UniProtKB/Swiss-Prot annotation:
GO terms for molecular function: thiopurine S-methyltransferase activity. The gene is tpm. This is Thiopurine S-methyltransferase. S-adenosyl-L-methionine binds at residues 10, 47, 68, 130. SUPFAM superfamilies: S-adenosyl-L-methionine-dependent methyltransferases.
Amino acid sequence: MEPGFWHSKWDTQQIGFHQNEVNPLLIKYWPRLNLNNLVNTSVFVPLCGKTLDICFLAELGHEVIGCELNETAVEHFFTENDLSYSTSRVGELQKFATEQVSIYQGDLFSLSHEALSSQEHRTIGAFYDRAALIAWPEEMRQDYVQKLAALIPPKSIGLLVTLDYPQEALKGPPFAVSNDWIMANMAEFFEVEILSCEDVLSENPRFIKKEVPWLTESVYRLIRRG
């Protein structure tokens, strides 16, 4: 999955992956992470786009740190939410920042643990992945998991949302990620608890049009081992 693919999507505004409201699963399950003692910590949101989920997390009192490849997406997040921001260079990335939200724009694999743990940020205690893991084809997905594990401290608690369907029925993204894949490839780094798995085919016309026979959406609670 080359960067040009995602830049093209944003350039042409083919951003069906973007949701114009806060994700209902975030609203429902974020309290299940039991983060009452982590109000003063940061939440890391990889491949964040311009998601309104960031605003929801910030309104809960969290500092939110995102990472997004496309500069247009980051600019749109701040302008569409009427947020003034400053910019600075951090290594190979550009950092957009306002009081409670920072987004590192550039390649996730160029983001360092040191940048996230600098004195400018609160300690990361949580993370949220709704559209990152499922954005990677299987041959790149494990590299992403290892990078995520390297970026966040031990004991960090995360909410992960995935989709699963017969991959041969539809060319991703979003790519199919099964529960078996999660357990085989993420359990080394994270304690994994599945919170829900629901049939969502009727809510996704694209999948129906392509005659995908079934589609499930799962929610996981993860805890970074260590």
